[in-house]
């Protein structure tokens, strides 16, 4: 689609509508999505005095990866590495844990691979998991990107997976057949893609500085936003209630839009409306990731300046709440606990850290990577049968 004129978070109005129905696909993980998430987080239920490490491993899936060609599973509360998997193909760029906590998707160069988050494997003795890692075969592979796969996200029932890459495409994969159902051309290398909570839209950003909304019902780009021409947009996040969209760029700036559902008069179909509400300078240099907390009360930003910053979203003011300091090099990724009380960060200093957000203190360090740790995924959501 044609680029809109330069302007502050310019929005191309939606053309057409979306019925908000998710795409038809089969769950390749062998599960029909019968597990439903419910609060609170398991993280706050694991004080060492009341829960064992084994229970920790079963209730919390914490994974890190990076440039040492390993994927590491951690016992979140003890800080011990429970399993290491070799990923010899390339560095690992992104991780995403399936909603049922059984599978981790791993994005590398040209490929997304799926590995089991096996409780049995997670409870192997540490003598059986050397630092170089075990050679474990993936249960599935998604091939088709050219160059690095920079982002991945799961459909809420695991029926499909979305990926974005340096080749300028977004691909939606059937998780059973490992084949792409949809391919969208972003016209520029994709840095991030997320799924709207309604499961009917995607938000993505790219190296040219654009943020796009993709309407899956209409099978097209419905909005294009260009906050700053030719300033790479690094990361996007959507609030869990679908109320706002946040994007962060290479100049350390954050842009925020309100998201509303509307109905087009022409065909009476539902569509998303975007309203710019604020922008602010979060860091003095590159922002590598932005993430809204599950309760939508906080925004976390991490940066090349070695910090993680926590911002209050109250009334869209985005006041600085805390600066989390302790990493020695770039911080590349962050992931919140389900109750928004904790956050895990991954850094070029080879270390991942668990932060208690009420105090701003590091509760655990996860040591074991031999090169930069650039991605982290945490899923401690309680599942009901």
Regions found by a protein language model. Give the residues of each.
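Per-blade loop-tip surfaces of WD-repeat and WD-like beta-propellers in eukaryotic adaptors/scaffolds
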Residues: 73-83, 114-139, 146, 172-190, ...
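Conserved strand-to-loop turn within each blade of WD40 beta-propeller repeats
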Residues: 65-68, 106-110, 164-167, 205-208, ...
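Intrinsically disordered, low-complexity acidic/Ser/Thr/Pro-rich linker and tail segments
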Residues: 1-77, 121, 125-131, 383
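Canonical WD40 repeat/beta-propeller blade segments in eukaryotic WD-repeat proteins
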Residues: 36-41, 45-53, 90-96, 147-153, ...
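Residue-level detector of Asp-centered blade-edge/turn motifs that repeat once per structural unit
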Residues: 56-58, 99-100, 156-157, 197-198, ...
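Eukaryote-specific detector of the first structured module of a protein
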Residues: 48-113, 117-119, 374
